[in-house]
């Protein structure tokens, strides 16, 4: 196996048995690809901005004399880069410029000729751009647009499952859902009449829409019914026989022919009878008159002589009419063939309840439903109906919708028009009637073939189109009214509606969310999330169990584990590891092709619709070396069911065992041993882990850690191979290999690292280099670790030595006992960065001022401020300290003559202003790490702002100068090589400045040209460098674009270091969460016979009922991994020979059935072995992939190799008494996380604060500085103890006795510790409530 430079530093021992067939795809591709489609010009006009423009343009004027045509578009350059936008609170976006063509026609009587053409580029607002990591910067904050899983456009057949009507009758319905436009529903009522609804309005008989489509009754009956033809011969009625139509009927007469009786009267006609009639080729039978009476005639019968209608179509035959027909010479009568079994008379019955009788009346009926109260005119009714389903502007099925529509109706063609036509509507009605007749089945709405994913690009395109449509109306009016000769395209387009639509979507849509940035995993999961909520989706309240449930088609597409607990369960899902969307937006998952039992390397992506036709084997099916299945019978999935199939029947096989789970769930080792509910919690809690100060890779991982860390974008990854030329805390410089260099470039890659930046969740983002000077690196290697990563692997928590045992009740109910050593070693210490801002506004009374001259504030309080009134960087501040001094003008107060005199004498200003400084919130203490000042254009900058500007300029100049020097030295190395090849002495040259080297006269023409070329390159580089500095300088010194009325904003960043403490929440990766109950001295913790104490004591009772056994297996394997690490550490300490070290590590890697990983350490140099050993001395990292992990015997092998008992249990001693505990205890290493539920953020104590307006009781919650609720049960407790005075205090002065509490406050101030309880306000509220019911209630005083 070939290892990259980073992987060689620390190899993970892999217990995976199945070979890796397919690499994990780039995890953010769903976001990036979707947005790329939106933004890149698509010549086919199917996607993105191009599609939106083409759907709206050309815009014609109402009079048709002119039109505005779309030519092309381009996106301009962004003003600020991503980091600058975040600092300034700006949106990272690019201006959209569209080339439009205005064509003016000269109208003749016969034709229009082009009179004038004007082309112009028009600005159409800003389009937010996606960063490289799949996020958007909107107003300075990082946001993610979550993909939406919505009902695919198309036609769906469904039923109410008998829930609507009290009789329990199943009512069927069909719904045509377009991508945009009106919905069309068909539904049966309990009387079996078929109705239609447009846009869920009032229902109409289905015949109305058929009449509106220009069908008359006769044509409607012809379309939907088969005919029975009765002939009248010699006063006898003869039926032209189609034998199948008799099935299931009871013969009401003897069915006979030529004297032979085939079915006796009263007998049920069976398939045997029908076959007999067919065999004897009986084409007609004589029937009694009763048989024809009551049947429904399929067409109008009109007397040819008189023109009188004898019987209209869809009317029952009676004896009287039969006679009339005979008289008028009709000897052949067509009736509808209907029966109760499979040919119901639904359309015929519906026609009877329909009051309309022609197209016009049907159109008027539709108009009345859609536009109630408006008078219908012929033109208006026709326009409305035409626009509803047949106009491309108002109705769009989309390519997906048309494909689904045609597939549902079993048509061969998948393409077609994007609007509906007559055939579509008729075919849908036919199919729903077939379903009602028992042919065909209803669709499963929760099948992933009926739900598609709408990603960022598509949603942004829809919003953009909405904006364009708003502009279209205005343009049409301008084209009709304006003076066309002077009009230019620029004059017609107003970019505001477009910008507003796009801004609204990115800023306030339910699916554009504030990014969850706790750690790299939470970022990735947020970007891969799929929500059923949002515009055009479901709502929480109305979503039933079926939608939320796991469906068989989720396999390999949507994770069955990772979903939130609570009201959103099942509505918000996560994409599976290998899943992707196809061109239609349906989720698909990869499979290996299988032919005659041979598994090939060929990979096909199948959507849920295609998958149903195949038999698919699981990933853990046994295969021999040649690729054949070893077992005759293989467990497979087919049409959502699992069963055994012959190996030769199998069509496909899963790609990987972790195919079904999401990224979050695939990081849980031994997931297969955990209960699903706990696995769900585990997957969700990993996202809440706070990045620790010192990262620590998980000893027991799943092999997904590297993929997550690299794809999340928090690490710095090498773009090209090369050698590390320079490293410091903030930058890495790589000299690129010549093979990968572009022509005319210096061959240097510079990576600037992010230092101590605030994340959305106030955690700290910081990158640290993990390469050294002179090291050779390859493309894709990790150069710097970000938050929660360790040597390019995801590291969310710490490996802790845990023991499962009770300890004096301190681990009752999931509490956790932690050793003090964990605090001392800063294992779970985290840094949180808070941004506090102070805004200086222009008020009616004058401008607020930021200064250190604050009224009534002592010297001590101002000691940390500079002369501009802003805190120093590096100052340590606590709650209540002033960060930014600010004074606000106060309204003029009436002054006494004495005060006026004093003011006139001393010119005192202090009383004009009040202190409104920015202070540190209570309970927060930390270090100021950065200050940013934003000043409005035209407002004079203070001294501190200028200092900050100078510092920034210096830093940028220094950075760019260093960058330039590196490029320059690279160029001169080139020149030196050229000189050396010409045997020119370079010692003298070294004394000359670089620029003079270019003027050295060289005889060889080709070499001279090369030097000239390099000189030109040097000149260009210098110019570019100066240009860069100038651009940066302008950006820094220009005024900021602030909100109206804001003069200045000062942002102060505080870094708070938080150690772990009682009350903090911790968890493992298996849903085993708990709160720290006590931090115990190291000497009191249980220890083993070597004197090593445990770090954490967990309650063993937390395991059996919760069924997350994965944590126990992780503990055992962790113990073995640490044991092997200890042995390597011992060998390093005793300076064993490197050959012995190599052998030992090789043995460790060879343990177990390593079918996937074969490590050969002979290819490693001695230095590499030493470096590897140093990284393994704290434990050998292990990978146990999901559903393909380490087996029990392998864990035992590992324990044995580490020299530990194979039971995984050891004898422990009590730290306090030194006595043995009575039985061996499970001790091992578990990966523990500190979650972002810190006691510091939750705990507060109320002194005196705000009260509720109505009840006058204290508010609740930390945000309102609220009190503790003393509820009903607490009152019972005090009553039970007979603590009457305490109870009285709780119900009055401590709660809502307004007078009592004021008096008590006064008494305490006076030193009089007495209280007089009065009437609680809530009692008065109760009185008023009773009075509002009309009952007078008064209190009598004794």
From Swiss-Prot:
GO MF terms held by the record: DNA binding; DNA-directed RNA polymerase activity; ribonucleoside binding
Q: Which reaction does it catalyse?
A: RNA(n) + a ribonucleoside 5'-triphosphate = RNA(n+1) + diphosphate
- Keywords for this entry? DNA-directed RNA polymerase, Nucleotidyltransferase, Transcription, Transferase
Q: Does the record bear Cytoplasm in its keywords?
A: no
The UniProt entry's GO CC annotations, sorted and at most eight, read: DNA-directed RNA polymerase complex
GO biological process terms held by the UniProt record: DNA-templated transcription
Give the main EC class: transferase
Q: Which InterPro entries match?
A: DNA-dir_RNA_pol_bsu_ext_1_sf (IPR042107), DNA-dir_RNA_pol_bsu_external_1 (IPR019462), DNA-dir_RNA_pol_su2 (IPR015712), DNA-dir_RNAP_su2_dom (IPR007120), DNA-dir_RNAP_su2_hyb_sf (IPR037033), RNA_pol_bsu_bac (IPR010243), RNA_pol_bsu_CS (IPR007121), RNA_pol_bsu_protrusion (IPR007644)
Question: Under which EC number(s) is this enzyme classified?
Answer: 2.7.7.6
Question: Please, which domain of life does this record's source organism belong to?
Answer: Bacteria
Function comment: DNA-dependent RNA polymerase catalyzes the transcription of DNA into RNA using the four ribonucleoside triphosphates as substrates.
Record-stated family = Belongs to the RNA polymerase beta chain family.
The subunit structure is:
The RNAP catalytic core consists of 2 alpha, 1 beta, 1 beta' and 1 omega subunit. When a sigma factor is associated with the core the holoenzyme is formed, which can initiate transcription.
Name under which the protein is recorded: DNA-directed RNA polymerase subunit beta
Q: Which organism is it from?
A: Buchnera aphidicola subsp. Acyrthosiphon pisum (strain Tuc7)
Task: Quote the gene name from the UniProt entry.
Answer: rpoB
């Amino acid at each position: 196996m070939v290892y990259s430079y980073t992987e060689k530093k620390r190899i993970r021992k892999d217990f995976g048995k199945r070979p890796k067939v397919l690499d994990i795809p780039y995890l953010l591709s769903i976001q990036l690809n979707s947005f790329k489609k939106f933004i890149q010009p698509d010549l086919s006009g199917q996607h993105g901005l191009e599609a939106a423009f083409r759907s709206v343009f050309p815009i014609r004027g109402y009079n048709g004399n002119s039109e505005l045509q779309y030519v092309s578009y381009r996106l301009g350059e962004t003003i600020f880069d991503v980091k600058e936008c975040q600092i300034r609170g700006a949106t990272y976006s690019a201006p959209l410029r569209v080339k439009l063509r205005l064509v003016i026609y000269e109208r003749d009587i016969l034709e229009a000729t082009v009179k004038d053409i004007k082309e112009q580029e028009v600005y159409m607002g800003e389009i937010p751009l996606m960063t490289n990591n799949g996020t958007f910067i909107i107003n300075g904050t990082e946001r993610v647009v979550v993909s939406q899983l919505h009902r695919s456009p198309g036609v769906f057949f469904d039923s109410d499952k008998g829930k609507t009507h009290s009789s329990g009758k199943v009512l069927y319905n069909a719904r045509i859902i377009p991508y945009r436009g009106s919905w069309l529903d068909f539904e049966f009522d309990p009387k079996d009449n078929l109705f239609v609804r447009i846009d869920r309005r009032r229902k109409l008989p289905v015949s109305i829409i058929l009449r509106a489509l220009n069908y008359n009754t006769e044509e409607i009956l012809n379309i939907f019914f088969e005919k029975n033809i009765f002939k009248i011969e010699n006063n006898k009625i003869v039926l032209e026989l189609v034998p199948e139509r008799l099935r299931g009927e009871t013969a009401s007469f003897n069915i006979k022919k030529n004297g032979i009786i085939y079915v006796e009267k009263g007998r049920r006609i069976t398939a045997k009878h029908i076959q007999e009639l067919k065999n004897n080729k009986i084409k007609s039978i004589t029937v009694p008159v009763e048989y024809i009476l009551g049947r429904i005639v399929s067409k109008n019968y009109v007397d040819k002589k008189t023109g009188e209608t004898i019987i209209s179509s869809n009317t029952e035959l009676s004896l009287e009419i039969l006679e009339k027909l005979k008289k008028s010479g009709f000897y052949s009568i067509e009736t509808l063939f209907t029966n109760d079994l499979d040919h119901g008379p639904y359309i015929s019955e519906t026609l009877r309840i329909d009051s309309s009788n022609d197209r016009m009346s049907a159109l008027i009926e539709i108009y009345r439903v859609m536009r109630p109260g408006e008078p219908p005119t012929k033109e208006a009714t026709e326009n409305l109906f035409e626009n509803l389903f047949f106009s491309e502007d108002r109705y769009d099925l989309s390519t997906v919708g048309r494909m689904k529509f045609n597939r549902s109706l079993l048509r061969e063609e998948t393409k077609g028009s994007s609007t509906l036509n007559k055939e579509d509507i008729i075919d849908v009605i036919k199919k729903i009637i077939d379903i009602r007749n028992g042919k065909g089945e209803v669709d499963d709405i929760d099948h992933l073939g009926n739900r598609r994913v709408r990603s960022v690009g598509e949603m942004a395109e829809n919003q953009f189109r909405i904006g364009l449509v708003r502009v279209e109306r205005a343009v049409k009016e301008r084209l009709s009214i304006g003076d066309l000769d002077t009009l230019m395209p620029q004059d017609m387009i107003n970019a505001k509606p477009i910008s507003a639509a796009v801004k609204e979507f990115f800023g306030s849509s339910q699916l554009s969310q504030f990014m969850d940035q706790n750690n790299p995993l939470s970022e990735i999961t947020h970007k891969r999330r799929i929500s059923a909520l949002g515009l055009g989706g479901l709502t929480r309240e109305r979503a039933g169990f079926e939608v939320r449930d796991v469906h068989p088609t989720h396999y390999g597409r949507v994770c069955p584990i990772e979903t939130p607990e609570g009201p959103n369960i099942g509505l918000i899902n996560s994409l599976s590891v290998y899943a992707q969307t196809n061109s239609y937006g349906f989720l698909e998952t990869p499979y290996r092709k299988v032919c005659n039992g041979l598994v090939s390397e060929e990979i096909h992506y199948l959507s849920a619709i295609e998958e149903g036709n195949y038999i698919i084997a699981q990933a853990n099916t046994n295969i021999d070396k040649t690729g054949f299945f070893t077992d005759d019978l293989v467990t497979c999935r087919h049409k959502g069911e699992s069963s055994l199939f012959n190996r030769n029947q199998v069509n496909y096989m899963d790609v990987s065992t972790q195919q079904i789970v999401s990224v979050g769930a695939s990081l849980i080792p031994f997931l297969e041993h955990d209960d699903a509910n706990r696995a769900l919690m585990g997957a969700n809690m990993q996202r809440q882990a706070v990045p620790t100060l010192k990262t620590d890779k998980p000893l027991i991982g799943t092999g997904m850690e590297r993929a997550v860390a690299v794809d999340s974008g928090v690490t710095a990854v090498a773009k090209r191979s090369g050698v590390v030329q320079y490293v410091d805390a903030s930058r890495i410089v790589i000299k690129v290999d010549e093979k990968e260099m572009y022509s005319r470039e210096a061959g240097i890659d510079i990576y600037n690292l992010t230092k101590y930046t605030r994340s959305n969740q106030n955690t700290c983002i910081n990158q640290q280099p993990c390469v050294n000077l002179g090291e050779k690196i390859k493309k894709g290697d990790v150069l710097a670790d970000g938050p929660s990563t360790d040597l390019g692997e995801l590291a969310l928590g710490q490996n802790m030595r845990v023991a499962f045992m009770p300890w004096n009740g301190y681990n009752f109910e999931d509490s956790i006992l932690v050793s003090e050593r964990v605090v001392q070693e800063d294992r779970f210490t985290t840094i949180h960065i808070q941004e506090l801002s102070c805004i200086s506004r222009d008020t009616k009374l004058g401008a607020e001022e930021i200064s250190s001259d604050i009224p009534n504030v002592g010297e001590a309080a101002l000691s940390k401020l500079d002369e501009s009134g802003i805190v120093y960087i590096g100052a340590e501040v606590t709650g209540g300290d002033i960060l930014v001094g600010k004074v606000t003008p106060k309204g003029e107060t009436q002054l006494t003559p004495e005060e006026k005199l004093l003011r006139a004498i001393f010119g005192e200003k202090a009383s004009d202003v009040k202190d409104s400084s920015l202070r540190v919130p209570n309970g927060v203490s930390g270090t100021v790490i950065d200050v940013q000042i934003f000043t409005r254009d035209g407002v004079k900058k203070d001294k501190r702002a200028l200092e900050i500007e100078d510092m920034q300029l210096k830093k940028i100049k220094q950075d760019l100068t260093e960058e330039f020097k590196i490029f320059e030295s690279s160029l001169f190395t080139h020149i030196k090589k050229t000189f050396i090849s010409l045997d020119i002495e370079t010692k003298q040259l070294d004394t000359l400045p670089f620029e003079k080297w270019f003027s050295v006269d060289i005889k060889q023409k080709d070499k001279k040209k090369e030097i000239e070329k390099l000189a030109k390159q040097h000149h260009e580089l210098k110019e570019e460098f100066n240009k860069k500095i100038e651009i940066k300088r302008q950006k820094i010194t220009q005024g900021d674009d602030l909100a109206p009325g804001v003069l200045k904003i000062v942002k102060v960043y505080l870094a708070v270091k938080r150690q772990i403490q009682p009350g903090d929440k911790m968890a493992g990766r298996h849903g085993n969460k708990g709160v720290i109950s006590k931090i115990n001295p190291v000497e009191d913790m249980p220890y083993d016979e070597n004197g090593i104490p445990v770090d954490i004591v967990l309650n063993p009772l937390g395991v059996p009922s919760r069924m997350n056994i994965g944590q126990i297996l992780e503990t055992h394997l962790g113990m073995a991994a640490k044991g092997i690490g200890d042995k390597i550490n011992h060998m390093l300490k005793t300076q064993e020979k490197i050959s012995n070290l190599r052998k030992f590590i090789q043995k460790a890697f060879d343990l177990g059935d390593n079918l996937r990983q074969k490590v050969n350490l002979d290819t490693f140099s001695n230095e590499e072995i030493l470096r590897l050993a140093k990284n393994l001395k704290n434990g050998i990292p292990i990978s146990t992939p999901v559903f393909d992990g380490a087996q029990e015997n392998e864990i035992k092998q590992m324990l044995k190799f580490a020299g530990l008992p194979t039971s995984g249990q050891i004898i422990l001693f009590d730290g306090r008494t030194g006595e043995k505990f009575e039985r061996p205890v499970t001790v091992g290493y578990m990966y523990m996380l500190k979650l972002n539920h810190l006691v510091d953020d939750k705990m507060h104590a109320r002194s005196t604060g705000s009260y509720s307006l109505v009840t006058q009781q204290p508010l609740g919650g930390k945000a309102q500085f609220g009190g503790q609720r003393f509820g009903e049960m607490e009152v019972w407790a005090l009553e039970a103890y007979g603590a009457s005075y305490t109870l009285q205090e709780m119900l009055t002065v401590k709660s809502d006795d307004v007078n009592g509490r004021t008096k008590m406050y006064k008494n305490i101030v006076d030193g009089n510790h007495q209280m007089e309880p009065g009437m609680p306000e809530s009692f008065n509220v109760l009185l008023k409530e009773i009075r509002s019911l009309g009952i007078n209630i008064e209190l009598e005083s004794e």
